[in-house]
Swiss-Prot record:
Record PANTHER family: RIBONUCLEASE P PROTEIN SUBUNIT P21, RIBONUCLEASE P SUBUNIT P21
Organism listed in the record: Methanoregula boonei (strain DSM 21154 / JCM 14090 / 6A8)
This protein's name: Ribonuclease P protein component 4
Assigned GO CC terms: cytoplasm; ribonuclease P complex
tRNA processing listed as a keyword: yes
Length: 104
């Protein structure tokens, strides 16, 4: 079965929409964290449907296990180890590790 070709203008629009959803999630988090989680879920759906990667700066702002918007100190714990950073979502207790390169 052949893939349907999408117009080339859809991907930039999807990237822009994802950026808007993450900025809105950041603004509304302290008033209603549930809305922030919903905005992240919508951004992930757009990303999957349009096959657009979520930018690196946004990928670390949500839990990949439960799709919650993460804010350090509020619903996320950050621990720094040798060579990596451990981020724990306090909603689902899932830990994600990110590699950190040392600066000389």
């Amino acid at each position: 079965m052949k893939d349907k070709k999408r117009p080339p203008s859809v991907k930039p629009l999807a990237r822009e929409r994802i950026a808007v959803l993450f900025s809105e999630a950041e603004k509304i988090f302290h008033e209603n964290p549930g809305y922030s989680d919903r905005y992240v879920a919508l951004a992930r759906k757009i990303s999957m449907k349009e096959r657009v990667r979520i930018d690196h700066e946004y990928r670390r702002r949500f839990c990949h296990h439960c799709s919650r918007y993460l804010v350090p100190g509020a619903n996320m714990r950050v621990r720094v180890h040798h060579g990596w950073v451990a981020v724990t979502c306090l909603g689902c207790k899932k830990t994600t590790r990110y590699r950190v390169e040392r600066t000389p």
